[in-house]
Amino acid sequence: MEKLGLNELRERFLKFFESKGHLRLPSFSLIPQNDPSLLLINSGMAPLKPYFTGQEEPPRRRVTTCQKCIRTPDIENVGKTARHGTFFEMLGNFSFGDYFKNEAIPWAWEFFTEDLKIPVERLWVSIYEDDDEAFEIWNKKVGLPPERIVRMGKDNNFWEHGTGPCGPCSEIYFDRGEDKGCGKPDCKVGCDCDRFIEVWNLVFTQFNKEEDGSYSRLKNPNIDTGMGLERLACVMQDVNNLFEVDTIRRVLDYICKITGVEYGSSEKTDVSIRVITDHIRSTTMMISDGVIPSNEGRGYVLRRLLRRAARHGKLLGMDRPFLSDVASVVIKESKGAYPELAERAENIKKVIRIEEEKFEETIDQGLVILSKYIEETRKKGEKVISGDVVFELHGTYGFPVDLTREIAEENGLGVDEEGFREKMKEHQNLAREDYQSKQGSAWGDDIYSKLDKSVKTEFLGYTESEATARVLYIIKEDQVVDEAQKGDSVTVILDRTPFYAESGGQVGDKGLIEAEGARVKVLDCKKTNDGKYLHIGEIEEGTLRNGMEVKATIDKKRRMAIARNHTTTHLLHKALRNVLGSHVNQAGSLVEPDRLRFDFTHFSAMTPEEIKSVEDQVNEKILESIAVDIREMSIDEARKMGATALFGEKYGDVVRVVKIGDYSIELCGGTHLNVTSQAGFIKIVSESGVASGVRRIEALTGEAALKHFDEEEKLLRDIAQVLKTNPSDSVKRIESLLNEIKAAQKEIEQLRSKLVSSSLDDVLAKAVEINGVKVVTARFDQFDMEALRNTGDTIRNKLGSGVVVLGTGFGGKVSLVVMATKDVVAKGIHAGNIIKEAAKVAGGGGGGRPDMAQAGGKDVSKIDEALKQAVKVIESQLAG
């Protein structure tokens, strides 16, 4: 049996099925699209669900993929065993109503025995116990003897997911040899020992499970297969676990090299090495696909993995951030299959480095705190660390709960996870793995899923702004109706339309649908996965009936404004990459008629110079009046041209390419200008952060940009008028006024100091003594809070030992300050507690340290009373 590397195996599989008429699709993003049931893609078929359900039309009836997958339910076992991992690649060949068992089974056998040359005698199969059809194909067509075909029950060999498409499956097993088994004479497929390893699962989706639990046959059965690439590599390389597979082993070896720890020297260090190896593979792929560390959802999964890996690095003696270096090895090993890794390498490593540095700031302190709580828990004779402690470690020190659990288990303790979850709920910040149960299923129904799936709306909007059409459906109050009257809110589905439906960040068109005796004001347009355009609006006149001939007309002026912003968004994306670097990728966008919003990956606020450079570059391209060339082509042809694809977007065999000269080329389904000069110009109005590693630009074009400049110009004129100068001299006038103010403030401060100096002796002379402690109270209404604090410092220093209580009503606001020398703090004085009670009298609040505190209040007339209350509290503290 030929020893093949993981990368070669992947390519051999995909090429084999291409030879069988399959379209090779690139791996979909790990971020699910329109599937609230999943946090991250966890199987080869997950991103293909819409094709299996008929919600979307597949690019071809036969498809093959190698899909990146993440699974984290068993994260605590990763590292402890050599089998568990969070990242894996799933090979698959799929048929959407095309071929079935007669082809799928022999092809699987052909790939194994002829392409990979796996010895026939090492292969076994299992089938569903009632699937005689599969048995006949394996036995008669393939030639496998009956004793090597094992019938198994529903739990093992029948795939179903609640209600919906389901069916039997057949699994192919590799016999690792008797020496890996249990030694029992009846050992075969299904035995719990390590001899037989399941390599390939062929799912025959031929039934539909109904609500009542019955099964009906699907008109067009499907094929869904899945084979773990790493597991296949274990077989072909004759190794015992995924960490010994060639590409993964090279990552592991690099970790050993930089830590100076030999793999296999101890089980404890082996666990840490395996944790880092697995987690860096997962995190590198997640960041490449646009996941950013956060405290919720998939961002929290990423943070957990990175921080767990960082902690295990410390256990190996790493005292510096190192994970981004290891990520470079992952990128090197996988960039052939996933070229985007190389393109985004800088971005990936920067995300990892920043997150590791953040954790580095708190982990040591957190470990000290956790050690203290572990010791306290043991002293109490308890076995569980409280949920409050787990929450404190999570919120203050950035410890994911599974990291706290892992450390607790190493010390023979458990954690109160239920208590932790309750605390998280209180703070509305629960990041959960059971996202699926909270968000519902991607297989769920709505009114539109019950409509005829073969009915689609023909989109004419790329070339037409109005069109005649026929009403196919009218939906009112979530019900399909035959007609609707004036005043009704409706959704209208037409057989053809010029209305663009919201997608790709571009908002839907507005306009009118008119017929004889009826008019609908369209306020928005969306579309279903199966291609129906939903014209959402209100009937302004008459009665709209199903089957009516209508005229659909978009708001052309609004559409043009949207096109300005959409084309400019493409220019902006390219300019950002030119100015900031190739790590910049689109993380989201909103294209409206009056503005554009663009989110992108970058790790610091842009400087004013960078913003100006981007803006200038976009305006330069607008002024060049570059033709916007839009055409359809194959996805392969588009990639060869260098077209930029967006994170997580699904693309079919044929794609729409928007090319702006030699400057920008992107895959895009939106509406655009004919030439860039139609945009007028761009004005960036804001740049801000929206998440860790994600920045946002908001900008205006065309009329909106002109309006913005008009408003700015008016503001400048108004300022100049107030300053009694010309607009061009406003800055000089403001600088002059600021200098005058600064000089005046300096003079005031000098006068204030003289005033304080002259009155200090009087203030100190009025000091009272309480239980041997000097207490000074005074009121300075001419001082603001800053001056009051400075005066308090001066009096405390002159006093030498004692308490100072000052108040002011400057500007109509109450300000109070309490200061104490260290020796009286030792006697029981606490400035924070004193001021808290004093401020209540004046209708305010505050607090602070034992030696210094300040507060505010609302009632200036109560200042003297507040000072007296402070003295009472001091008496109480000294008496206690």
Curated annotation (Swiss-Prot):
GO terms for molecular function: alanine-tRNA ligase activity; aminoacyl-tRNA deacylase activity; ATP binding; catalytic activity, acting on a protein; transferase activity; tRNA binding; zinc ion binding. Its cofactor is Zn(2+). GO terms for cellular component: cytosol. Pfam families: DHHA1, tRNA-synt_2c, tRNA_SAD. The keyword Protein biosynthesis applies. Binds 1 zinc ion per subunit. It is found in: Cytoplasm. CDD domains: AlaRS_core. It catalyses: tRNA(Ala) + L-alanine + ATP = L-alanyl-tRNA(Ala) + AMP + diphosphate. SMART domains: tRNA_SAD. Catalyzes the attachment of alanine to tRNA(Ala) in a two-step reaction: alanine is first activated by ATP to form Ala-AMP and then transferred to the acceptor end of tRNA(Ala). Also edits incorrectly charged Ser-tRNA(Ala) and Gly-tRNA(Ala) via its editing domain. This is Alanine--tRNA ligase. It comes from Acetivibrio thermocellus (strain ATCC 27405 / DSM 1237 / JCM 9322 / NBRC 103400 / NCIMB 10682 / NRRL B-4536 / VPI 7372). The lineage of its organism: Bacteria, Bacillati, Bacillota, Clostridia, Eubacteriales. The gene is alaS.
